[in-house]
């Protein structure tokens, strides 16, 4: 159960964005974006919150704002590899049971949304847990940048057992479609197994890392939430985050 699980929250981040250079350090209402993310992750109160980065500049900025950071290698191909290195350094004795992986470009994410990502690990046998939201905008159903979840309903309509993730419009026929939110919670054993697997055929075809776990027989359960947090990938996204902040008075 969740009460007995020791949890660590990790935020992998780097400066190497091509679409939005120096994205983690972009100013939003007087604070770097990565600091907003760290503030919200810490507010979720899922154990220790640590930023994992290969950038000394990010490390110093995060520390200056009172958050913990750890340096990782610069040659990681994915955030999963980066958080595994951080976990091994932070907890070499293996006391941590579950790791929450929060993307460093979600400055408006609700702390409760982060907390909900752990629920499938608390309630059931999932190896990995993640989040989804029902698609209500018609254009998103055919947008390949909106990743869809194909899954079997669990616990009414608030959770799915993931069978597949795809950029196509799926599943076919009447019924809701679900947008995948790329925030994960891993059992430690699942993360250790996942990073040792090579890229899978469907992962390479769809360009979706989570398919590696499904192809290896790992179970992913999806907690359904009400809203999609704003991910910042472009200048337009950053402008929206700044507008949200100025209108709300804070993120």
Swiss-Prot record:
InterPro entries: Cytidylyl_trans (IPR003329), KdsB (IPR004528), Nucleotide-diphossugar_trans (IPR029044). SUPFAM superfamilies: Nucleotide-diphospho-sugar transferases. CDD domains: CMP-KDO-Synthetase. GO terms for molecular function: 3-deoxy-manno-octulosonate cytidylyltransferase activity. It holds the Pfam family CTP_transf_3. Disulfide bonds: none annotated. Pathway: Nucleotide-sugar biosynthesis; CMP-3-deoxy-D-manno-octulosonate biosynthesis; CMP-3-deoxy-D-manno-octulosonate from 3-deoxy-D-manno-octulosonate and CTP: step 1/1; Bacterial outer membrane biogenesis; lipopolysaccharide biosynthesis. It is found in: Cytoplasm. It catalyses: 3-deoxy-alpha-D-manno-oct-2-ulosonate + CTP = CMP-3-deoxy-beta-D-manno-octulosonate + diphosphate. Activates KDO (a required 8-carbon sugar) for incorporation into bacterial lipopolysaccharide in Gram-negative bacteria. Belongs to the KdsB family. This is 3-deoxy-manno-octulosonate cytidylyltransferase. It comes from Brucella canis (strain ATCC 23365 / NCTC 10854 / RM-666). The gene is kdsB.
